[in-house]
Amino acid sequence: MRLLTVGGKVVSVGGKAIEIPDSSGGVYQIAAETRAGASVSATKGTTTVSGTADTSGICTLTLYEPGEWSVTAVLGANTRTETVLVGTQNVDLMLFKDAFAENDWETIIAVCQSGSIPSTWAVGDSKTMTINDTDYQIDIIGKSHDNYADGSGKAPLTFQMHDCYKTLYQMNSNNSNNGGWNNCDMRTTHLPAIMALMPTAVQSAIREVSKKTSIGNRSSTIETTADKLFLLSEIEIFDGPLFSFDGEGKRYDYYTSRTLRTKYLNGTAQSWWQRSPYKSYGDDFCRVDGEGYEGYIDPNTELGVAFAFCF
């Protein structure tokens, strides 16, 4: 229900519009975009109009006076106010905390989906996510780095696990890199199983991005896959490819030092998989070792997994 206050009198606006013209004779609207369930109010002098954002996060307020209105959205402890000059126009009232870690994942998802990321959210910022009863630190590793697979533009943020997932996995049980990233067990079996354990809101919001990887078996041919959860390639972690072919992307801004490439499992430094097939053999994939250096190993070896994703 919306409440309209005109000249100090409150009028309910329910299932149909009630128009109360003032001396200016105008009827105007503000369409406020915010979070679902947020309380939205517009105030000008002694006149206030209020409403609640629908499930899509839109609250349309009907006003009866032009001019400058103060529009406020409130949801829990979050409040944001913007001043708008009313004819009919939209106002963005996306609610978020300036400190990335202080936002819940639903808010982070909503901000990413809006396409407008606050400047205070920086590469290297992190937030905890609970997956299958275990808490993991999730880092921002890039901004506007990955392309959406549907061609609709760039993902505002790319996220990756700060350390390794609690279970070690083989890259390919057949001990081959033939078929590359596209056909390996990690991509077709293990990562989908992990994704099914992530928070429901996160699962629903993760979008496919385009990842480039060689097809394996010593071939320099690069193919593009559409991935929700993915592993990083060698060039996305290091300054240049040493054991993989050119063309598998570019380095994420996060990976500026060997220390940042070192990941842990239960407090111990752990080697972790890359998606890059080793260019000189038909039976190895690339890895990052426990000291943060590049390397390669048989794909039926169980190593750490630090997957990435975008909203």
Residue ranges and their predicted role:
Residues 32, 57, 71-73, 140:
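Extracellular/surface recognition and adhesion modules
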Residues 44-63:
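Short, acidic Ser/Thr/Gly-rich low-complexity loop/linker segments typical of extracellular
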